[in-house]
Each structure stands twice: as C-alpha cells, then as structure tokens.
Amino acid sequence: MDERRPDLAIQFIPLTYLGIPIPYRGRTGTEREKVAKTYEEINNRIKTGEAVVMTAEEVVDLVREKGAERAAEEVDVVTTGTFGAMCSSGAFLNLGHADPPIRMTNIRLNGVEAYGGLAAVDTYIGATSLIDPPGTGYGGAHVIEDLIAGKKVHLVATGPGTDCYVRKSIETNISLDDINEAYLYNPRNCYQNYGIATNTSDRTLYTYMGKLLPRMKNATYSSAGTLSPLLNDPHLDTIGMGTRIFLAGGEGYVSWQGTQFKTTVEEVNGVPVGGSRTLAVIGDMKQMDPKFVRGLDITGYGISLAIGIGIPIPILNADIMRNCAISDEDIYAEMVDYSLPSGRKCMQRYNYAQLRTGKIEYEGKTIRTSSMSSLAGARKVANTLKDWIEHGEFLLNEPCLSLPKEGKLKGLKDGGQ
C-alpha cells in the first residue's frame, strides 16, 4: 500500500454545501455546545495520529450509551463497508501500441469480448461480458480479477488496417505491468439497500439474486445492513463527487451519481426500504488487492463481479453521527416474488436483524434466508479502512460536487416513439 497518496486528499475544491462552518470548541471545553468539525480539523487529527475512528457496527452501542452529540464529540470518522456482486462494473485499459501499430476494433481478453470502439488501443471490458463460446463460467469479471491478481491474460485483437495503423492483427499475453493505464470505472455500485427475493411458483428460478427454490422455500437478500455505506449517510450529506473511498483494496473516488439513481423510495427510520441511491466509482487497478475482487459465476444467470467498497464518514456534527448509528433492527427491506415477470409488489417488510437469523415467517410459513453479499467481507473492508486512517495513510476528501437531492427512474418504452 506504499503507493497510496494521502496528499491527494487536499487537492479537491472545498464546498460549503455540507454546512456553514461553526467554531469547533475542541475536546477540552467544559460547556456543552453543538458539535461542529471541519474536514481540515479531522485530517489534521489523522495526520497526527489523534483521530478516533470506529466502524459503523462499533458506533451503534456507543450512541445508545452516550447519545449522538456526546458520541460525535468523541469520534472523528466512521468507516463503512460492503462486499457483494456489482454487475455494473468494468475496466478501462490502454494496451499500448505495437510496432507496427494496429487500430484494434475487435478485442478479446482470455476469450472474453472487450469493447473496441474507442481509440486505437483503448478498450473497456465489462464485468458481465461472456467468454466465446459461452458456458464455461468465465467472463469479464474474471479477466479483471486475473489482471489484479498479477496473472497474464491472452490478448487477441484485429483491425481493418489503415495507412497510419497498418497492422491487421496481434496476439500476445499481457499483465498489468505490461500495459499503460488500467482502472476500474463502475457506473453503478454501492446500492443503497435492495429487495428480498423469493419464489412462489412451482419451479426453481435462477436469478441475479441466486437460486430461488419453489413455493417460497428460501429468500435471498443483498446488503451489509448496518455497515452498508449509503445507509450510514442516507441523504449523501458527506458523499459526493471526489469523495475518497476504499475500492477493491486500493484507493478510489466517487466520480458521479450511479446509474438508476433515485430518491423516491419510501423511507422507514430515515433510510429507504429498497434500491435507491447509487454511486459511480473509479480507481487504479494497479493499486488493488485481489482479496477484495472476485469474479462470480451465478448459476443460470451469468457473470458478475464482487467488489469490496468502503466509505469513510466524517463526523462533522451530531446529525451525521446519529445517521451512522442505525442498526440492523432499524433497516427494512421489502420481499417480492421473482416468479412474476412484472408488477412485483411488496409482500412484506423485514429488518436485517430478522433476515440474519436465517429464517423469517410469512403467513405461517417459515422461509430460510441467505445473503448474496458477504458480511465478513464487509467487516474486513470497514476494518481495513479504519486501520489505514488510524495509521495516517488515508485522508478524507470534501466532495467537490454534491450528488442530486432528487432523482427519478424512467422506464424503457416498448415500441415507443
């Protein structure tokens, strides 16, 4: 992790949308005043090793014991984490020019198609792209994992041949050390909550939520609950463009709102009960750790990429601390029937404490539950990020642009004008 650059944390233009600065009374004041800190103060404490950092799980009991305002005085940063399937992910690669050069228009990496519609040797490989011929359980996500793990990947590329790019084909092996830039750019990661999937039909369903047994014999969900990044900052008061994050074992940044970003989902206890806000993120693959990146073959569905993402929440005031103290008992998700091709409606709501027991009750029926995301992985992410901050290796960035406060989804019209 020697390549991490804490100095990058101060290069973004600061905003005041996070609140009008209020003088911070410090840790030794005797009067109880409203807690107000700044990014600069927190970063200075990180640099000197004085910052108090806790994970989102750890602060739940602290706030219950001392209240949000007292806890906000004591804690500087809360770390979050999630580790689960994030299909809307991929990597930009610059493969370098051969001699003689080629303008690549058809590109395959380990047999997986990559996009050839960029400049001569730039490409984007999507996580869900399939190997040709399909059926081996390998795809773009596995290519990304292999590259991050330091493995060689077989490149085959062709082009039309032009006066300036005379070559028409090339075949070689590449690794991250051999190519120029390589970075993840994921258009939609870090979903703010998600639904619970079950199956009321008489046949087994194979979905991106896993294998759903007939007649509601099981239900699956996908969230880190208490640790989930966007559930700890539900209205994105501290998360925006330029926020520095833990991405796949390296450092990354929030680059924009994620696709399918919406704010119209009903909230319970201050957080949405279904998929709501999302993030687009970017990071240097050459800094990443293969322990936090996994190519997935989801039976009967296809390929996806599991990624570990952690976001530090600066405790600027008591309201932010109060948001970070949300527990699994407070976070609800809606169960829906995936056997319905459309018009899926909520059957019942359950909180994550109930889901994590391994079973729920629905109209007198006991349903087994399991998670599509890794709670152990989420904890590893949050604790690793905590360790980085405590050792002064990771500073916080104030966003240079806030993400939308309102967002609605549009559906695709079938045959529409």
List each language-model region with its residue ranges.
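Long alpha-helical, hydrophobic tracts
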Residues: 12-117, 417
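Conserved mixed alpha/beta catalytic, RNA-binding, or beta-rich assembly cores of soluble enzyme
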Residues: 67, 75, 104-402, 407
